[in-house]
Each structure stands twice: as structure tokens, then as C-alpha cells.
Design a protein with these regions (language model features):
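A structural signal for well-ordered alpha-helical scaffolds and beta->alpha junctions
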Residues: 40, 44, 77, 81, ...
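Non-heme Fe(II) oxygenase catalytic core, chiefly the N-lobe of the double-stranded beta-helix
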Residues: 49-52, 76, 85-142, 151, ...
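Catalytic core of Fe(II)/2-oxoglutarate
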Residues: 134-142, 152-272
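Non-heme Fe(II)/2-oxoglutarate
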Residues: 12-15, 21-101
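Eukaryotic charged/polar low-complexity linker/IDR segments
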Residues: 145-147
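A structural signal for short, well-ordered beta-strand segments and their strand-loop junctions
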Residues: 34, 58, 107-110, 116, ...
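Histidine-centered active-site/metal-ligand motif
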Residues: 32, 129, 194
Length: 272
């Protein structure tokens, strides 16, 4: 399938890619870009009109630090989702992602850590965090996140902006509103904290996005890092303590399980 049948052609020309690369490299506090009208209009409309109902998404992430649903079983959804995934995982698009980011050998996978959808109802949030940097089943190094928001008529008072923080959590450098057909591409490592505050949306509304994570081979510089939630400066002392305690216990617990040879605790297929 021609990538320009899915991705807006104005973003795939050599001139456009060079311009995005310049913006990506010069973004602070870490490399990221925001692209408007990412998909062709008809594609974005089809994704929006056929977005799966939240009660059909079988992975529910609800804890002190997050409240959202997700899924990646494309065979259960309208064919447009599979068509989009096929283009985004294509060699042609992965080569564009390499040109755009400067990271050689980017590719994605067909599992939960490849592509899928996120959705949150009223009250949904994901506290600021850094991502796990490995797909353990594919044995690949996670390098780039691509999020495309699919929320028509999103209002500022709904909240849900994706916050871009510096590593030390001293300053929030950017807020990306999850408006319709807006893409966010960013480098993911321990220097890239991000998350969104609790949303306040009317009944029937939700915060929706299509995600793809891009990888490279592990390489000699790879060092495993788990996902980790990080307190905001204005969090209460009690919440900061609770987050720190929970994350410390989680990481130590996973280290223990890893020593026992259990590597995929967080990556099991919860949809079967």
C-alpha cells in the first residue's frame, strides 16, 4: 500500500522530512515534534468514526498513577486500523522515521508494544513517567514513540494535554493538546518524562489515540530501564511518597523475577 494513501503527502516529501528533522533535533528538553493533519483527512475520519468502544478494550490500566484502557487486537476492529498499521510498519515509512529522527534501523513489531490504541474516559490520567526501553519478547530497544490523537471537538477545558518535562522535573517545556489528527513523535529514554493530567469530559466523550513504538536492535550501548512514574513538583508530599514507594517496590520486584528468568510480566497478552 502506498504510504501517501494513509499519511498526508505534504509530510513525506524530502523537503518536509528535512524540516521536521531540524525541528526534532532542536526541540527541548528532549527531541520531539508535533505534526498537524498527520493522516489524510478521509483516513483520520474513518479511524475516528470506527474507533473501538472503550468497554471493548480489554487491557485496563488503573493504579495510583494511571487510569486508561488500551488494546492491540486489530482483527477485532474496522479494517482501516490494520491498513494504517501496515503502512506505519512498512519499510518505506520506517525509512522516513530514520531520516526524521537520525536513528538508523528503526522498525516496529506486531504485538502490544508495536501498535494499538489508547482510550480514557472522564477522569482518565497517566502521571508523568519514562517508558520501559525494551520489547523483551522481540529483544529490541525502544527508541521512538508515535502518538496520533483522534479527538474531534476537543475543548481546552477537557484537559489531557501531553506534558513534556525535563529529566529533573523542574520545568514543563511543552503541552500538546490531544486534538484531532495531531501527531506527536518523540525520542523515548530516561531523559523524556511525559504524561497527562486527569481529564474532565462530558458523557460519551473520551481521549483517544493511535500509537506505534519504534525499535532498533539492542546494540552495545543498550542498558535495560524499566518504566517509572515520577512525581510532579506540585504533587502532595503524601502522593510523592506513595509514588516513590510503589515504583521502588515495583522495580525491585521485577529485578527479582528477572533473576528467576521471568522476563515478560508486564507484556502478557491480557486479551485472550
Amino acid at each position: 500500500m502506498d504510504i501517501n494513501s494513509i499519511i498526508n503527502p505534504k509530510h513525506t516529501s524530502p523537503e518536509a522530512i528535512k524540516a521536521w528533522r531540524d525541528k526534532f533535533d532542536n526541540a527541548v528538553p528532549y527531541r520531539h515534534i508535533v505534526i498537524e493533519n498527520f493522516f489524510n483527512e478521509d483516513v483520520a475520519d474513518k479511524l475516528y468514526n470506527n474507533f473501538p468502544q472503550i468497554d471493548t478494550l480489554n487491557v485496563k490500566r488503573k493504579s495510583l498513577n494511571e487510569n486508561k484502557s488500551e488494546d492491540y487486537h486489530f482483527d477485532r476492529w474496522d479494517p482501516i486500523f490494520s491498513e494504517v498499521r501496515e503502512v506505519i510498519k512498512s519499510e518505506e515509512w520506517c525509512n522516513i522515521m530514520t531520516q526524521l529522527t537520525g536513528i538508523d534501523g528503526l522498525k516496529t513489531t506486531m504485538d502490544a508494544l508495536g501498535s494499538g490504541v489508547h482510550q480514557g474516559q472522564n477522569g482518565s490520567y497517566v502521571d508523568v513517567h519514562v517508558d520501559v526501553n525494551m520489547n523483551p519478547q522481540a529483544n529490541l530497544w525502544r527508541r521512538i514513540n508515535l502518538l496520533v490523537y483522534l479527538n474531534k471537538n476537543w475543548q481546552p477545558e477537557y484537559g489531557g494535554d501531553l506534558e513534556v518535562w525535563d529529566k529533573g522535573m523542574k520545568k514543563m517545556y511543552n503541552k500538546v493538546s490531544p486534538t484531532f489528527n495531531r501527531a506527536l513523535i518523540f525520542y523515548t529514554d530516561d531523559n523524556s518524562p511525559h504524561g497527562y493530567n486527569k481529564i474532565n469530559v462530558p458523557e460519551g466523550e473520551s481521549r483517544k489515540s493511535f500509537y506505534t513504538y519504534f525499535y532498533t536492535e539492542l546494540g552495545k550501548d543498550f542498558k535495560y530501564r524499566d518504566s517509572k512514574f515520577i512525581s510532579r513538583p506540585d504533587d502532595s508530599k503524601a502522593r510523592k511518597l506513595a509514588t516513590t514507594t510503589k515504583e521502588t517496590l515495583k522495580i525491585k520486584g521485577k529485578q527479582f523475577l528477572k533473576a528467576l528468568g521471568i522476563r515478560s510480566l508486564d507484556f502478557q497478552d491480557k486479551n485472550k
